[in-house]
A protein has these predicted regions:
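Hydrophobic positions on the alpha1 helix immediately C-terminal to the Walker A/P-loop
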Residues: 273
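Conserved lysine of the Walker
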Residues: 270
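Active-site signature of alpha/beta-hydrolase-fold catalytic machinery across serine-
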Residues: 276
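Hydrophobic anchor at the beta1->P-loop junction of P-loop NTPases
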Residues: 262
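Conserved NTP-donor binding/palm subdomain of two-metal-ion nucleotidyltransferases/polymerases, i.e.
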Residues: 1-39, 43-258
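ATP-dependent small-molecule kinase phosphotransfer cores
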Residues: 295-346
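P-loop (Walker A) phosphate-binding loop of NTP-binding proteins
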Residues: 265
Length: 346
């Protein structure tokens, strides 16, 4: 079977007895099982230890990230599928937090175990489409940031990305309208009308930036126990720190790392092999290349050219001076590269 390895992983998870579900982007499960996008699993918080033990037993490795990518109640795990030759990335959530990028300060207070079902096409437990649609509406509303560069440049009607449109269309065709109304009445009573307003705007293709800001305000003010907003001063400071440290973002795995050396004569394929491996691993991990051969760039070329010119003109001391600078430049470049290198191990 095409996805036999990842299918077996989920069979083990299903048989473990640990409550979990895939709670978002279930329209894209075919892409996830092919190893081309991530899985987002919501796991019972009381079963964390058992679930993590099973992941390690199955060959997963926990991926760590710098502060800018750390979110409350979420961990990352990687699994190499040698059948597909892909790295599967699992986002493991122990509570449902969402919100603006880098912030994620809104907690959805709901017992997901009441709403889990088996997917019809893949061996995975998913959240029922009515809850997924409600969550997608709330995520879309509160992810909107008027000050984001994309929205400032648009200055017009708000537009959703294609992947989100695909999710909305899939869910709107999959939901049971009566079930949807029952869930909204019982679990989202205080904000159900705002959720319905957004769905109506989506169906009429009339989602405006003003409408999104209005919905953010109304839901925040009208919310009962469905959502919990973290707006403390300390949390705002954490958001500011994340924003400032994003440029230093790094991903690594728990077991440390490994240095892979490629040695060979010119033309043996070292560069192409390194590029292929670097591209593959960089999809999920921070990897740096350290070149120990002759540095060839514009500065080195210019210094060598000046050395050659003065040598031709019989100014040997000046020529040697520039040759010395070539050596210093190459050495400094290698030191700089060595400090940047992140060691990885798979």
């Amino acid at each position: 079977m095409q996805y036999s390895q990842i299918n077996n992983i989920f069979s083990e998870l299903n048989n473990s007895g640990v409550p979990y579900c895939h709670f978002k982007s279930n329209a894209n499960l075919d892409i996830s099982f092919a190893g081309n996008t991530d899985f987002d699993l919501l796991v019972d918080k009381h079963s964390i230890t058992a679930f993590k033990s099973l992941l390690y037993k199955l060959g997963f490795k926990q991926r760590y990230t710098t502060f800018d990518k750390n979110y409350v109640c979420m961990e990352d795990y990687l699994y190499y599928d040698d059948k597909l030759e892909k790295i599967h990335h699992f986002h493991i959530h122990y509570d449902l937090f969402f919100g603006k990028k880098l912030k994620k300060n809104i907690f959805l207070n709901i017992n997901f175990q009441k709403f889990i079902i088996k997917d019809e096409n893949f061996p995975i437990i998913i959240i029922q489409p009515e809850i997924e649609l409600i969550l997608l509406v709330l995520r879309t509303i509160f992810k909107f940031d008027l000050l984001a560069i994309r929205n400032i440049l648009l200055l017009r009607k708000f537009s959703l990305v294609k992947s989100v449109i695909r999710e909305f269309d899939h869910l709107l065709s999959a939901i049971d309208r009566n079930k949807m109304d029952d869930i909204l009445n019982e679990y989202f009573n205080n904000i159900q009308f705002f959720i319905k307003d957004f769905i109506n705007m989506y169906n009429s293709k009339n989602i405006t930036m003003i409408a999104l800001l209005k919905l953010q305000y109304l839901i925040t003010k009208s919310n009962g126990e469905e959502l919990f907003f973290i707006n403390s001063q300390k949390y705002k400071k954490l958001y500011s720190i994340k924003k400032n440290t994003k440029k230093f973002s790094t991903n690594w795995i728990e077991s440390g790392g490994r240095t892979i050396a490629f040695v060979g004569v010119d033309g043996s394929g070292k560069s192409s092999t390194i590029e292929a491996i670097h591209k593959f691993l960089s999809y999920k991990l921070t990897v740096e290349k350290l070149y120990l051969g002759k540095v060839s760039d514009y500065k080195a070329f210019s210094l060598n050219l000046l050395s050659a010119i003065f040598s031709k003109l019989k100014f040997q001391k000046i020529s040697q001076f520039f040759r010395g600078w070539v050596s210093i430049y190459i050495a400094s470049k290698k030191v700089k590269f060595s400090k940047k290198v992140k060691i990885i191990k798979i």
